[in-house]
Swiss-Prot record:
GO function terms (MF aspect): translation elongation factor activity
Lineage summary: Bacteria, Pseudomonadati, Pseudomonadota, Betaproteobacteria, Burkholderiales
Keywords per UniProt: Cytoplasm, Elongation factor, Protein biosynthesis
Function: Associates with the EF-Tu.GDP complex and induces the exchange of GDP to GTP. It remains bound to the aminoacyl-tRNA.EF-Tu.GTP complex up to the GTP hydrolysis stage on the ribosome.
Highest taxon of source: Bacteria
UniProt-listed SUPFAM superfamilies: Elongation factor Ts (EF-Ts), dimerisation domain, UBA-like
Stated family: Belongs to the EF-Ts family.
PANTHER family hit by this protein: ELONGATION FACTOR TS, ELONGATION FACTOR TS, MITOCHONDRIAL
Pfam families for the chain: EF_TS
CDD domains linked to this entry: UBA_EF-Ts (cd14275)
Subcellular location: Cytoplasm
A GO-annotated cellular component: cytoplasm
Region (Involved in Mg(2+) ion dislocation from EF-Tu): 80-83
Protein name: Elongation factor Ts
Length: 308
């Protein structure tokens, strides 16, 4: 089994907000598997273990470009936060978003093949990317993009350079902008419950079932009454219902007025949201977590060895 290091415990705590000892126990039980340990914590501690899942550590920027009813949202990644603030890197990201909006490329490869020159590099976007890698000395990747061109109005919201939202709508632009800000804050995964991916619902049901099974085993061990299968089933479905309410945009309480749902706010304003895209830099990506203490210790040991 892999040794459980302090940096692993810290990483898991950063992802889950769980107590340090619980993180260590989960990692030990999972044999050092970070994903499995996170799942174990969700079962043991409930939904609060997933609240910090959006604390993404990969670097880069999100950029957008809107031109009338055409627009684009794109994520461009770098290795360090320092490079993500580099002017040439930022220019590349903004240019890539504009190229997507103008040309509607089929994929990243098609985007890279589009004509573009910057900083003496070209004649394609991919050539510029490779040139900047050599110039700056750090890898950078055009990770993903979303094109909008269905003929609806568009509005965007950028929270710094790490969170970006584009909303397709018909109606009041001010309300649509507020909804874009809401999406950045609340991070829904779909417009309505019907649009939530089946695999996410299945995963949530699995976590709720595992939590119920653990509670049953604990009750039996302690000699307490065990919930009936009917109650357990209702409990599991209740957890799924709550999850759908939490992650479907229309069901969410509006951030600027939690007495109303987003759906109610839109209806009152005569506005409809047709779709949206939300990008968070590094979402779903792994990033190397350096054990700084171990690194320093290794450097000290190497220095001592050099002296002797």
């Amino acid at each position: 089994m892999a040794a459980i290091t302090a940096s692993m415990v810290a990483e898991l705590r950063g992802k889950t907000d769980a107590p340090m000892m619980e993180c260590k126990k989960a990692l030990t039980e999972a044999g050092g598997d970070m994903a499995k340990a996170e799942e174990l914590l969700r079962i043991k501690l409930g939904t609060k273990a997933g609240k910090a899942a959006a604390r993404i550590t990969a670097e880069g920027v999100v950029a957008c470009h809107i031109d009338g009813t055409r627009g684009a949202l794109i994520e461009v990644n770098s290795e360090t936060d320092f490079v993500s603030k580099n002017d040439s890197f930022l220019q590349l990201a903004r240019a890539a978003a504009e190229l997507v909006a103008r040309h509607q490329p089929a994929d990243i490869a098609a985007l890279g093949a589009l004509a573009y020159e910057q900083d003496g590099f070209g004649p394609t976007l991919e050539d510029v990317r490779k040139g900047l890698i050599g110039k700056i000395g750090e890898n950078m990747v055009l990770r993903r993009f979303r094109y909008f061109g269905a003929g609806h109005r568009l509005v965007s919201y950028l929270h710094g350079t790490r969170i970006g939202v584009v909303v397709e709508f018909d109606g009041d632009a001010t309300v649509a902008k507020d909804v874009a800000m809401h999406i950045a804050a609340m991070k829904p995964v779909a417009l309505s419950s019907a649009g939530v991916p089946a695999e996410l619902i299945a995963a949530e049901r699995s976590v709720a079932a595992a939590k119920a099974a653990e509670d049953k085993a604990r009750a039996e061990a302690e000699g307490r009454p065990v919930q009936s299968d009917d109650i357990v089933a209702k409990r599991i479905e209740g957890a799924v219902h709550k999850y759908l309410k939490d992650v479907a945009l229309f069901n969410q309480a509006f951030v600027k007025n939690d007495k109303q749902t987003v759906e109610q706010v839109l209806k009152a304003a005569g506005t409809t949201v047709k779709g949206f895209a939300l990008y968070v830099v590094g979402e779903g990506m792994e990033k190397k977590v350096d054990d700084f203490a171990a690194e320093v210790a290794a450097q000290v040991a190497a220095a001592k060895a050099a002296v002797t």
